[in-house]
Amino acid sequence: MPSFDIVSEITMHEVNNAVENANRILSTRYDFRGVEAVIELNEKNETIKLTTESDFQLEQLIEILIGACIKRNIDSTSLDIPTESEHHGKLYSKEVKLKQGIETETAKKITKLIKDSKLKVQTQIQGEQVRVTGKSRDDLQAAIQLVKGAELGQPFQFNNFRD
C-alpha cells in the first residue's frame, strides 16, 4: 500500500547561513552603527538569541532575521518568536526557538483533519512524524493538499513516499 510521512524539519546548515547573512546585513545597516547588536545561533539548543540596546531595535533585528530566513527558503512559521523581551541592564534580548519535529498536539490535529475529510487513508503518529497510508495515490495526494491548505502554525514536508 502506498504511504508517505509528514515531517517538520529545518536544515541547521541553512539556519546557520541565514544567521550569518542577517549579521552581515546588521553590520551594514546605518541605524545599527555604534550599537551593540548581535544575532547568535545555538545549534545544540536549536535557538537563535537576538540582543540589542532597545526594544524597537529588537523588533528590527527580528525583521532582519525573518528576511534572511525567507531568502534561505526557511519558512518564518518555523521560528517560535516570544512576544515578551528579556531586559538585562542596558540590553534587551529574545530567544527564538526553532520548531523541529511535529508535536503530539499538532500530530493529533493533522490526524483529525484527515479523518474528518473522509479520505480513504489511515494515519499513524510515529514520534515526531505522521505516517499516512492509503490504497491509491490519488487519496494520498488529496491528503497532502489538505495538510498543505491547513494553517497549523508550522511548515510541513512530505517524504518517504512508498508504493
Curated annotation (Swiss-Prot):
Alphabetical keyword list: Nucleotide-binding
Q: Which GO terms describe its molecular function?
A: nucleotide binding
Cite the InterPro entries for this sequence: DUF520, UPF0234-like_C, UPF0234_N, YajQ-like_sf
What GO CC annotations are associated with the protein? cytosol
What Pfam families has UniProt attached to this entry?
DUF520 (PF04461)
- What function does this protein fulfil? Nucleotide-binding protein.
HAMAP family, A to Z: YajQ (MF_00632)
Family classification: Belongs to the YajQ family.
Q: What is this protein's record name?
A: Nucleotide-binding protein MS1759
Organism from which the protein derives: Mannheimia succiniciproducens (strain KCTC 0769BP / MBEL55E)
Name the lineage: Bacteria, Pseudomonadati, Pseudomonadota, Gammaproteobacteria, Pasteurellales
